[in-house]
Amino acid sequence: MSFDIAKYPTLALVDSTQELRLLPKESLPKLCDELRRYLLDSVSRSSGHFASGLGTVELTVALHYVYNTPFDQLIWDVGHQAYPHKILTGRRDKIGTIRQKGGLHPFPWRGESEYDVLSVGHSSTSISAGIGIAVAAEKEGKNRRTVCVIGDGAITAGMAFEAMNHAGDIRPDMLVVLNDNEMSISENVGALNNHLAQLLSGKLYSSLREGGKKVFSGVPPIKELLKRTEEHIKGMVVPGTLFEELGFNYIGPVDGHDVLGLITTLKNMRDLKGPQFLHIMTKKGRGYEPAEKDPITFHAVPKFDPSSGCLPKSSGGLPSYSKIFGDWLCETAAKDNKLMAITPAMREGSGMVEFSRKFPDRYFDVAIAEQHAVTFAAGLAIGGYKPIVAIYSTFLQRAYDQVLHDVAIQKLPVLFAIDRAGIVGADGQTHQGAFDLSYLRCIPEMVIMTPSDENECRQMLYTGYHYNDGPSAVRYPRGNAVGVELTPLEKLPIGKGTVKRRGEKLAILNFGTLMPEAAKVAESLNATLVDMRFVKPLDETLILEMAASHEALVTVEENAIMGGAGSGVNEVLMAHRKPVPVLNIGLPDFFIPQGTQEEMRAELGLDAAGMEAKIKAWLA
């Protein structure tokens, strides 16, 4: 994908941050305009995260202009907002490949650029890492500076506050920038507040502030008066008391789209000692009206025509598994007022929009707080309700102790609806749902189900919802269902699989939605095909029957082979001293990079052709 860089004459001068810092300051507003247009041009042609980057253009330019990156270390939280950062740090001509197989990584990635200090993808990690990096820089003694950029959503997570509490204790020299795009620029973000921010961040004020503390430290009444006077002045326009109490010097809020004002404030703050906190207000989707009006829809986009202002509509074909879940949720809630649904900031992605509108008093979005979500569900279960935690596989990892300690040990009936299980595609290593079967299978009392199609998914959700002897989990993939008929809901027998096809020497034991591919292989090789359904408890009787009547077994799953469902089958056979050969097909022992689901399954041998080739090579 090529771009006519002549349309962006100022941006064309910037292939690195060193070149950026050679530009006269007066040219930076023009650079910001061109950078925003370039981002629109590139993402609309290739797809990617969009609205967040539009909102951080001025901040990105200002940070790289003021700080000596990559010597100074700039850390982005999550990374959705880092496309302008990639464009300014030598990757401008490759931005059209982002999120594609072999292209730029969707998030800041250490292996991609020296400018990407921390590999990210999950939220709220930046401040913790930043403290460690700042402490290391202090010990290095080369005056290397550390900056963390975190959004208003990510900063609500407990990990961010744990980190800030620690920073207030050990007081490293670092800057945390809060990119607050929750609302349009407030009344406080005007000339007075910007002037106050520059005044309070200036060297004169800081020197007087610290000097006064030392002089009057032995005179408590005067020291307390100075503290209260400062708080009163700042409190007239500053909502930063919480961050001050955590030990940060708080500045803001300031206009995050005033690049020259940001540069002045950042220059003032750059040499201040101790933990600093700059609160900026931005508009998500800034500069592209459709994204400003609907930043959720334009958060991540497919290819689209920017002149139309509309994203392409889906073809209206098969429903996604997320929609299957959402429809089941509404159907069940209408019949049972004990149902409570919980999501950690994934309402749209998890298919819960309709439920949140129909049953607002039974819908809980706990924000980016996976640990809290799970233990909150435990409390609801103790109170006699039926909680369902709708969560992506990759994010459930963040609440593992809560699943084990707060739910499973107490045998509480919490249902986990695990979306995005298996290969997710363009978001790459940080978002693949590769490990949930492995990390859940070892938990006592856990029931784990792997549907092979949307009808089975509904039946399993129903089964898990009515299972009262402990927690249960249903895992299903990103993407569309297969188009089978939906039958009336009924409970499945726990721990029982079903034979889908009878063959001869080989039996394929399938776990989950790779069933269509497994069926093609079974037909080609005249193999028996089993829908195992349950990863825990396993259908040991059926496994032993297959071992006794076949010369070899193959297990198929879209989870890490290590510790996954296939490993469970191996354990059953060894426990019963059955010397039947077993081939485990699943995700290999490395972090799977980005690419479409189809591309990655083909590369990993998880499509029908790949599975058949693996089996034939193994049998040869």
UniProtKB/Swiss-Prot annotation:
The signal peptide, as residue positions, is: none
* Cellular component GO terms held in the UniProt record: cytosol
Chemical reaction(s) catalysed: D-glyceraldehyde 3-phosphate + pyruvate + H(+) = 1-deoxy-D-xylulose 5-phosphate + CO2
Q: Report a single Gene Ontology molecular function.
A: magnesium ion binding
- Name the HAMAP family on file: DXP_synth (MF_00315)
Q: How does it assemble?
A: Homodimer.
Member of which family?
A: Belongs to the transketolase family. DXPS subfamily.
Q: Which InterPro entries match?
A: Dxylulose-5-P_synthase (IPR005477), THDP-binding (IPR029061), Transketo_C/PFOR_II (IPR009014), Transketolase-like_Pyr-bd (IPR005475), Transketolase_BS (IPR020826), Transketolase_C (IPR033248), Transketolase_CS (IPR049557)
Cofactor stoichiometry and binding? Answer: Binds 1 Mg(2+) ion per subunit. Binds 1 thiamine pyrophosphate per subunit.
Pathway of action: Metabolic intermediate biosynthesis; 1-deoxy-D-xylulose 5-phosphate biosynthesis; 1-deoxy-D-xylulose 5-phosphate from D-glyceraldehyde 3-phosphate and pyruvate: step 1/1
Which Gene3D superfamilies does this one have? 3.40.50.920, 3.40.50.970
- Quick one: which gene encodes this? dxs
Q: Does the keyword Repeat apply?
A: no
Write the record's keywords in alphabetical order, separated by commas: Isoprene biosynthesis, Magnesium, Metal-binding, Thiamine biosynthesis, Thiamine pyrophosphate, Transferase
One Pfam family in the UniProt entry: Transket_pyr
Per the entry, what this protein does is: Catalyzes the acyloin condensation reaction between C atoms 2 and 3 of pyruvate and glyceraldehyde 3-phosphate to yield 1-deoxy-D-xylulose-5-phosphate (DXP).
According to its UniProt record, the EC number is 2.2.1.7
Cofactor(s) essential for the protein: Mg(2+); thiamine diphosphate
Q: Where does thiamine diphosphate bind?
A: 80, 121-123, 153-154, 181, 288, 370
Binding of Mg(2+): at which residues?
A: 152, 181
What is the protein name given in its UniProt record?
A: 1-deoxy-D-xylulose-5-phosphate synthase
Listed transmembrane segments: none
PROSITE patterns noted in UniProt: TRANSKETOLASE_1 (PS00801), TRANSKETOLASE_2 (PS00802)
- GO annotation terms (biological process): 1-deoxy-D-xylulose 5-phosphate biosynthetic process; isopentenyl diphosphate biosynthetic process, methylerythritol 4-phosphate pathway; terpenoid biosynthetic process; thiamine biosynthetic process
Native organism: Shigella dysenteriae serotype 1 (strain Sd197)
